[in-house]
A protein has these predicted regions:
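Conserved phosphate/anionic-ligand binding catalytic regions in large, soluble enzymes, centered on
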Residues: 1-6, 70, 75-84, 241-253
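Rossmann-like adenosine-cofactor binding region
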Residues: 138-240, 245
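Glycine-rich beta-alpha junction loops
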Residues: 2, 41-42, 135-140, 246-248, ...
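N-terminal ligand-binding/catalytic initiation module
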Residues: 1-77, 311-316
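Flexible, glycine/charged-enriched surface loops at secondary-structure junctions
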Residues: 30-39, 61-62, 98-106, 290-303
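Glycine-rich phosphate/diphosphate-binding loop of Rossmann-like nucleotide-binding domains
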Residues: 69-70, 75-187
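Conserved active-site and cofactor/substrate-binding residues in soluble primary-metabolism enzymes
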Residues: 9-20, 41-45, 49, 78, ...
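Adenosine-phosphate binding glycine-rich loop
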Residues: 209-317
Length: 317
């Protein structure tokens, strides 16, 4: 790994780092060995620089060696927003299990990057809406939800300044609360932390529990501290879903990108989305069934742990 932060660096600096990093890494990766993908700080630009250096060093066209690539050199449609899309599909399965529907649901999320934007877009498509979203500078409350042209503006705002969401409030005349997170607001149906690790600590978890909101769906990698997560799991009125299952859509579509690369095909966005939806339904199903099999009821955290452990154990046996 590395501790290089691309924030504030010039394109030339980022390119030089990516080239140097790949020069050290390329011997240990390959389409059938290990396939890195993007994450925080590693977007399409960085993947492009990394792949360019890989090709320069190897002298071959192995576009399956990295995922999250641009569409002109082997990328997949909806890969950037796949984690967010998948999280909403997982939420949809949770609601079905609880004899509920996603139609009309109000979501409070943190983050408005690729993951958060994916949640906003897919929620709007399925009849729900994100009414709260938080950024580094505070949170937005838009009772009408982030839909339509507002989704396009989020992309524009993020490209200009990813550290401030206040311009959204200024443009649409909605509430902005500076320096705060939206954990604890009561006029929502679902909480979805989708920004960074340890976003929700014990103080926030207590506010979430007190709000009376039933659904807590982790999306970012480990967005809840261990003590806060255990506290929320102990709330009888709540359903808690773990990030290790909920955010699998991103790596799932990375797998679909590799499949397209292997077959020399480019699938439509609808084809990729349908495969992603099927994938998330199955992830929820096996997690719920694993928990039930071991007498744990509808404990999705335990179910995901058990299902994941069993799959690895069976593969190693």
């Amino acid at each position: 790994g590395s501790d290089f932060d691309p924030a504030g660096k010039s394109d030339a600096e980022v390119m030089r780092f990516c080239q140097s990093f790949m020069t050290a890494l390329y011997r240990y990766i390959g389409p059938d060995i290990d396939v890195p993908a993007g994450d925080m700080g590693v977007g399409g630009r960085e993947i492009g620089y990394l792949y360019g250096q890989y090709r320069r060093l190897k002298g071959v066209w192995e576009n399956g060696v990295l995922t999250g690539k641009g569409m002109t050199y082997g990328g997949s449609l909806i890969r950037p927003e796949a984690t967010g899309y998948g999280a909403v599909y997982y939420l949809q399965e949770v609601l079905k299990h609880e004899n509920d529907t996603i139609e009309g649901k109000r979501l409070a999320i943190s983050g408005y990057g690729n993951v958060g934007w994916g949640i906003m877009k897919k929620a709007a498509e399925l009849g729900a809406k994100v009414t709260y979203f938080a950024g580094p500078d505070g949170y937005i409350h838009d009772p009408d939800g982030v839909t339509g042209e507002k989704l396009d503006y989020i992309l524009e705002m993020r490209a200009k300044d990813p550290m401030h969401c206040k311009p959204y409030a200024d443009k649409y005349g909605v509430e902005f609360v500076a320096g705060e997170k939206c954990w604890g607001v009561k006029d929502v149906d679902v909480y979805m932390p989708a920004a960074t690790q340890n976003d929700v600590r014990m103080e926030s978890a207590e506010k979430i529990a007190a709000s009376g909101v039933k659904y807590y769906i982790e999306v970012a990698n480990m967005p809840t501290t261990n003590d806060a997560l255990n506290f929320l799991r102990g709330q009888k009125h709540m359903v808690v879903a773990p990030s290790k299952a909920v955010n699998a859509g991103g790596v799932g579509v990375s797998g679909l990108e590799m499949s397209q690369n292997s077959e020399r095909l480019s699938w439509t966005a609808e084809e990729v989305d349908a495969q992603l939806h099927k994938m998330m339904k199955n992830i929820h199903k096996v997690s719920a069934e694993a928990a039930e099999e071991y007498g744990l009821g509808y404990d999705l955290v335990a179910g995901a742990n058990i299902a994941g452990f069993k799959k690895v154990a069976e593969a190693m046996y």
